[in-house]
């Protein structure tokens, strides 16, 4: 065992007072406390080299239980937030009214002169279709009337 591990160098404590260097074990300490341990502002003799805390480890359990409770609450809040976002997204996406297809196609807007020309052409086309339909209808009516007249004449002759 080296002398350097048994010698604690001098240091300034938290209240800014200088603590003289000392040898481990100190008077009044057990024979097992052979090593110099601690921080730059608190040094003491301990039984294991590299030990940094002069306290028993039981106080750590109370700290870790508090930390676990805090982390658990934070996790629940985060989970509630994520679930809320998912529900709102679902409602936003799937509860919209369904769009009905009305059969109309989207058309690009044209200048007014081009639009008027198209309207005039369409009106002329509709009139031509209307006239040909009417003529066909009248032609059919004439044929029906001729047949009716022939049948009437035959009945009269008999």
Curated annotation (Swiss-Prot):
Lineage: Eukaryota, Metazoa, Chordata, Craniata, Vertebrata
Transmembrane segments: 65-85
Compartments where found: Membrane
Keywords from the named record: Membrane, Transmembrane, Transmembrane helix
Repressor found in the keyword field: no
Membrane topology qualifier: Single-pass membrane protein
Highest taxon in the source lineage: Eukaryota
The protein, known as: Protein shisa-like-2B
GO cellular component: membrane
């Amino acid at each position: 065992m080296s002398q350097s591990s048994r010698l604690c160098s001098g240091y300034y404590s938290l209240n800014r007072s200088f603590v003289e260097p000392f040898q481990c074990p100190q008077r009044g300490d057990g024979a097992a406390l052979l090593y110099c341990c601690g921080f730059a502002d608190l040094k003491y003799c301990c039984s294991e080299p590299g030990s940094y805390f002069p306290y028993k480890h039981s106080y750590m359990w109370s700290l870790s239980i508090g930390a676990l409770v805090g982390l658990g609450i934070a996790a629940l809040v985060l989970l509630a937030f994520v679930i809320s976002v998912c529900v709102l997204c679902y409602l936003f996406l799937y509860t919209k009214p369904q769009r009905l297809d009305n059969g109309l196609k989207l058309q690009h807007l044209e200048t007014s002169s081009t639009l008027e020309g198209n309207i005039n052409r369409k009106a002329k086309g509709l009139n031509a279709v209307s006239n040909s339909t009417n003529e066909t209808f009248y032609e059919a009516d004439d044929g029906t009337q001729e047949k009716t007249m022939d049948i009437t004449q035959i009945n009269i002759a008999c």
